[in-house]
A protein has these predicted regions:
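Beta-strand-rich extracellular modules
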Residues: 26-30
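Residues within mature, well-folded domains
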Residues: 1-8, 13-18, 32-179
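Short, conserved beta-strand segments of beta-strand-rich sandwich/propeller modules, principally
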Residues: 18-24
């Protein structure tokens, strides 16, 4: 009606990366008329730390060696993105889908560390608490002790492991004391 034709096109979204695409539709047996439109494949709850490739690569320091980080950091933006995707692709528990659960969880932990452990002196994912949270996830239990003498102590409990942090400033800065 009114010169419009509607068509449903099955687009397998699970195979598209988080980016913008152009879709061009040509009418068959016409004067080569074409309609072009942009669409975006969007990861709605993408961790913010993945918005910066530099940050995303830097945060790998908790799970890989410096040589790998140097390799991922070299090259053009496109090459670095490809190498970054390849790095996580090798670790993807569901490689036939675009969504990588392991990568998503890792960078959610990076975001959490930024939001919860950042102080005036330290970005949260660079803090001792941030590092432990990124590596091990949320602790099973957190206990905070306020001794009458000495600094506040926070104990994070994981299966078969405890991490003890000691306050250094009274403003949320904690340093790993023992594990």
């Amino acid at each position: 009606p009114n010169g419009f034709t509607y068509a449903l096109v099955n687009v397998p979204n699970s195979t598209f990366p988080n980016t913008t695409f152009n879709l061009q539709v040509k009418e068959k047996d016409s004067d080569n008329r074409a309609v072009q439109s942009s669409f975006r494949s969007l990861w709605i709850d993408m961790p913010r730390s993945l918005l910066s490739l530099d940050v995303a690569i830097d945060m790998l320091r908790y799970i890989t060696d410096e040589e790998t980080i140097d390799r991922l950091s070299s090259g053009s933006q496109r090459e670095r993105e490809r190498k970054f995707r390849d790095f996580w692709g090798e670790k993807d528990p569901t490689p036939k889908t675009e969504y990588n659960e392991l990568m998503a969880e890792y960078y959610r932990r990076v975001d959490y560390s930024y939001e919860n452990f950042t102080t005036e002196n330290t970005i949260g994912y660079n803090s001792d608490q941030g590092e432990i949270y990124i590596k091990y996830g949320p602790p099973d239990n957190i206990q905070r002790k306020y001794p009458t003498e000495g600094a506040t102590v926070e104990i994070w409990t994981y299966p078969n492991r405890n991490f003890v942090f000691e306050a250094t400033s009274g403003f949320g800065d904690f340093r790993l004391k023992s594990n």
